[in-house]
């Protein structure tokens, strides 16, 4: 549902943020 989509978006954003910090 919508909540799952939102959680996926948040997880993607968090992962991208962490990856950007590390590299």
From Swiss-Prot:
Organism listed in the record: Ranoidea dahlii
Subcellular location: Secreted
Organism superkingdom: Eukaryota
Protein name: Dahlein-4.1
Keyword Glycosyltransferase: no
GO biological process: defense response
Function: Has no antimicrobial activity.
Tissue expression pattern: Expressed by the skin dorsal glands.
Chief location: secreted
UniProt keyword annotations, A-Z: Amphibian defense peptide, Secreted
Cellular component GO terms, alphabetical: extracellular region
Keyword Secreted: yes
């Amino acid at each position: 549902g919508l909540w799952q989509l939102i959680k996926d978006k948040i997880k993607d954003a968090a992962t991208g943020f962490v990856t950007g910090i590390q590299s």
